[in-house]
UniProtKB/Swiss-Prot annotation:
GO terms for cellular component: cytosol. Pfam families: CTP_transf_3. NCBIfam families: kdsB, PRK05450.1-1, PRK05450.1-5. It catalyses: 3-deoxy-alpha-D-manno-oct-2-ulosonate + CTP = CMP-3-deoxy-beta-D-manno-octulosonate + diphosphate. Its EC number is 2.7.7.38. Belongs to the KdsB family. It comes from Parvibaculum lavamentivorans (strain DS-1 / DSM 13023 / NCIMB 13966). Keywords: Cytoplasm, Lipopolysaccharide biosynthesis, Nucleotidyltransferase, Transferase. This is 3-deoxy-manno-octulosonate cytidylyltransferase. SUPFAM superfamilies: Nucleotide-diphospho-sugar transferases (SSF53448). PANTHER family: 3-DEOXY-MANNO-OCTULOSONATE CYTIDYLYLTRANSFERASE, 3-DEOXY-MANNO-OCTULOSONATE CYTIDYLYLTRANSFERASE, MITOCHONDRIAL. It comes from the Bacteria. Activates KDO (a required 8-carbon sugar) for incorporation into bacterial lipopolysaccharide in Gram-negative bacteria. The lineage of its organism: Bacteria, Pseudomonadati, Pseudomonadota, Alphaproteobacteria, Hyphomicrobiales. CDD domains: CMP-KDO-Synthetase.
């Protein structure tokens, strides 16, 4: 197996800290962090992808001891968090405060714990978008190429004006088909970068009206006047939410190991 020790290279600006929130509770796939993918728990597969990104320290924010144990057994770093926290962002922030109370890490990257086939380059892309002047938060989006996704409310759209570039400021996020008219639509990818102070402010804010209406946490930041930089990438990573998704992830990683 490849050496996945923490990178020894010179630290990037902001001393990035990658945090992977994970909990056992899942409506459609209970216990999914420990689901076996090619002989390895899914959360360990995600941890490996984050390590392969090479942006800095990686910590799993575990809601349960079983998750933390699996990560530590694989050689990773994990911290236990309150299982009753309301969101992944709150879990990330609690982990940040636990592992870095002195504030050494001023850039935080939030990688979902159900992305075992994630291209590590996407983590670096989120970092690069965040360190642009004026950005409080960064995230990713990809052009929608499947017609059904344009009207699917489970496919969240990032509304931004990319023009000829690959970076744009987020104007809105919605489950609706937006913007109206001819032109591309963008599938939002829930991988985030935060300035540390922006994450602290975000989790301290109450849920906002549009956040509650759309059931999209990132709208809280927009309603509070925070700037979200969106980087356009080529593909949407596979999120494992169902048994069918799990089989797709197993097949994809099995092909990689051949």
């Amino acid at each position: 197996m490849a050496n996945l020790a923490q990178p020894a290279a010179k630290e990037l600006a902001g001393h990035p800290l990658v945090v992977i929130p994970a909990r056992m509770a899942s409506t459609r796939l209970p216990g999914k962090p420990l689901a076996d993918i090619c002989g390895t728990p899914m959360i360990v597969q995600v941890w490996r992808r984050a390590m392969e990104a090479g942006v800095g320290r990686v910590v799993v924010a575990a809601a349960e001891k079983e998750i933390a144990d699996a990560v530590r057994e694989a050689g990773g770093e994990a911290v236990l968090t309150d299982p009753d926290l309301p969101s992944g962002s709150d879990r990330v922030w609690q982990a940040v405060c636990e592992v870095d109370p002195e504030g050494h890490h001023t850039v935080i990257l939030n990688v979902q714990g159900d992305l075992p086939t994630l291209d590590p380059a996407l983590i670096r892309t989120a970092y690069e978008a965040l360190v642009r002047p004026g950005a409080d938060i960064s995230t990713l989006a990809a052009t929608i190429t499947v017609e059904e996704e344009r009207t699917n409310p489970n496919v969240v759209k990032a509304v931004a004006s990319f023009g000829e570039g690959r970076l744009a400021r987020a104007l809105y996020f919605t489950r609706a088909t937006a913007p109206w008219g001819e032109g591309p639509l963008y599938h939002h990818i829930g991988l985030y970068g935060y300035r540390r102070e922006a994450l602290a402010r975000f989790v301290a804010l109450p849920p906002s009206p549009l956040e509650v209406r759309e059931k999209l946490e990132q709208l809280r930041a927009l309603e509070a006047g925070m700037a979200i930089e969106v980087a356009l990438v080529d593909t949407v990573p596979l999120g494992v939410d169902t048994p069918a998704d799990l089989e797709k992830a197993r097949a994809a990683l099995a092909r990689r190991s051949v």
